[in-house]
């Protein structure tokens, strides 16, 4: 019987879920349980001497039946008529039995039901789930979409066990409403508890999980300590699993995805192996919500069956003879804005840099660009020791439209400006770059960076946007990365008309829902060729898709290719049918740091390489679907 549930406590989970429904469900379950009890008592009474089971209930107040004195069954002459004392004793015993049945038993049953319901609703109930489950630690706003992603794969888990500090009813409601297949509700188990507590962690039985996701809580619960607590949770989890696995040499390594809210923290853990002692038990996989969205927007998933509303950064593939450059303008150096810039810097590399010296340009526009630039350059100090960049304070420029010098630089190969000079750390005479004079050449970095201080409503910045969108040799993309939804929409729809017409696409961040931008697009659709149709929403919490299996598979193939011998060819191995994913996976799990490089940095190098393949293939003239 228990094979279906795996453990008796799982049966309690099913009972709790049933009893926590509406009144009719509770009534039906109590009626069912009481009926079973009465049927059992009736059968016992029949076995004890009643000629029909129903008489056990009809004569419940007849002391003779309770004492087995029914003259129809027993010999009344031999036994005699019951005395008054016997009748009184029989009546007392019958009444006590009735009180026990109708009072104590019923009250106990109702109290038990109420307690089970309360424990279920509050998330205090715990169930012994040890097989075929995924553990999610934290109830961050992405938990609903993560559940949908896990339940839409081919091999879906039997259970998804969630531990978090938010109200469990609220979490359940969010998840249930977002589930594409409502039949999957029965797979969701929610516990309430602090993720920093080892007791709560152990209640998940994490050593038995298929996968573990540490996503943490929202800002109201975690504040600025989100990343710190998530890392502490990982170490607690790692030490516990190490204790449980001390004598198990055949234990399979568990993937443990750890979310970092801040780009700086996430970037740091992409380059370090933080848990070498237990890396054979837990596969530490850091990820960032905002970078995940940036990949979703900038890196098309060619294997996905869903329609993609996001365009690549170019209009037509850029080959070695093209004069065009890609220009990504990011309004707002928010978490999303920084993630978009980093992802673009990973993928926007084109062959016309080698042949024509054309560089991709990434521009930040922010009210506090000077301060944010300092943080950004400090975070990627090595990059800015070899990359050209400049800072422009649009607030200090005289406004007056085209009567003053515009600071947009249309020369992608050798940007020159009389007033707003570019810093070139590889060639400037006064440069203090460590790499100057290292004979790296001018063709080492093909991306330039701009930091423009000012509001998007500033006339000088609007002139800059017009110039950028009007440049025939520039494919201009705008990303409005303002976290406040109405502000982002307002900034997008009030762009100059020339910008709306001349831009390749205008991405508008929407934190919760795309209703505003979708309504604008729907209204604009009625007017053929309306420029507001170029507005595309992104960043919505209910559309985040943390499904990196296809990208990871490509990264593993790239890593496998690096390990091939001089006489081996991946294309021949693939075409001959000799390529086995087991070997590819083995080369990934057994990868070791090369020449002092951490394993984690090598993995991320392969993953970013995989993300850039779409653009490289496009530059070769290979069309999508070929």
Model-inferred region functions:
Residues 2-34, 48-57, 62, 68-95, ...:
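Cytosolic regulatory regions of ion transport systems
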Residues 32-43:
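Canonical alpha-helical transmembrane segments of integral membrane proteins
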């Amino acid at each position: 019987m228990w094979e279906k549930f795996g453990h008796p406590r799982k049966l309690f989970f099913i009972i709790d879920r049933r009893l926590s429904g509406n009144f009719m469900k509770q009534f039906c379950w109590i009626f069912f349980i009481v009926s079973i009890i009465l049927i059992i008592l009736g059968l016992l009474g029949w076995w004890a001497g009643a000629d029909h089971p129903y008489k056990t209930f009809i004569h419940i107040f007849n002391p003779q039946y309770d004492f087995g004195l029914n003259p129809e069954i027993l010999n009344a002459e031999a036994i005699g008529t019951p005395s008054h004392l016997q009748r009184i004793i029989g009546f007392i015993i019958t009444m006590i039995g009735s009180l026990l049945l109708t009072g104590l038993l019923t009250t106990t049953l109702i109290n038990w039901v109420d307690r089970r319901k309360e424990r279920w609703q509050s998330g205090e109930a715990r169930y012994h789930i040890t097989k075929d489950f995924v553990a999610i630690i934290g109830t961050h706003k992405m938990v609903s979409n993560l559940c949908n992603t896990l339940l839409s794969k081919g091999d879906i888990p039997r259970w998804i066990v969630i531990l978090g500090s938010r109200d469990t009813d609220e979490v359940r409601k969010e998840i249930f409403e977002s589930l594409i297949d409502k039949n999957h509700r029965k797979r969701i188990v929610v516990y309430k508890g602090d993720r920093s507590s080892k007791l709560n962690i152990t209640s998940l039985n994490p050593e038995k999980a298929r996968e573990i996701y540490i996503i943490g809580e929202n800002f109201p619960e975690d504040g600025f300590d989100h990343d710190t607590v998530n890392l502490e949770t990982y170490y607690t989890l790692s030490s516990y699993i190490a204790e449980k696995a001390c004598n198990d040499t055949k234990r399979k390594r568990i993937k443990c995805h750890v979310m970092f809210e801040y780009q700086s923290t996430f970037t740091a853990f992409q380059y370090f192996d933080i848990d070498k002692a237990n890396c054979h038990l837990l596969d530490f996989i850091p990820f960032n919500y905002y970078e995940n969205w940036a990949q979703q927007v900038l890196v098309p998933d060619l294997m996905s069956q869903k329609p993609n509303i996001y365009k690549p950064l170019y209009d037509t593939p850029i080959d070695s003879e093209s004069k065009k450059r890609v220009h990504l303008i990011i309004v707002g150096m928010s978490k999303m804005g920084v993630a978009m810039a980093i992802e673009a810097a990973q993928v926007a590399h084109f062959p016309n840099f080698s042949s024509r010296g054309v560089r991709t340009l990434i521009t930040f526009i922010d009210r506090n660009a000077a301060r944010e630039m300092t943080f950004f350059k400090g975070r990627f100090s090595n990059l800015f020791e070899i990359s050209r960049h400049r800072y422009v304070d649009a607030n200090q420029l005289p406004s007056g439209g085209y009567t003053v010098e515009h600071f947009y630089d249309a020369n992608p190969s050798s940007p020159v400006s009389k007033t707003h000079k570019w810093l070139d750390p590889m060639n400037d005479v006064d440069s203090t770059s460590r790499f100057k004079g290292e004979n790296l050449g001018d063709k080492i970095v093909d991306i330039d960076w701009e930091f423009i201080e000012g509001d998007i409503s500033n006339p000088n910045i609007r002139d800059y946007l017009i110039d950028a969108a009007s440049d025939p040799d520039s494919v201009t993309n705008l990303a409005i990365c303002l976290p406040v939804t109405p502000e982002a929409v307002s900034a997008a729809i009030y762009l100059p008309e020339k910008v709306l017409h001349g831009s390749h696409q205008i991405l508008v961040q929407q934190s919760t829902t795309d209703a505003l931008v979708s309504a604008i697009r729907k209204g604009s659709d009625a007017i053929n060729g309306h420029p507001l149709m170029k507005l595309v929403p992104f960043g919505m919490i209910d559309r985040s898709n943390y499904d990196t299996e296809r990208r990871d598979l490509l990264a593993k193939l790239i890593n496998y290719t690096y390990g091939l011998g001089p006489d081996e060819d991946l294309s021949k191995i693939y075409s001959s049918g000799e390529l086995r994913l087991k070997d590819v996976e083995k080369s990934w799990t057994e990868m070791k740091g090369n020449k002092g490089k951490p394993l984690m940095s090598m993995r991320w190098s392969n993953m970013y390489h995989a993300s850039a393949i779409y653009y490289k293939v496009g530059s070769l003239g290979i069309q999508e679907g070929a």
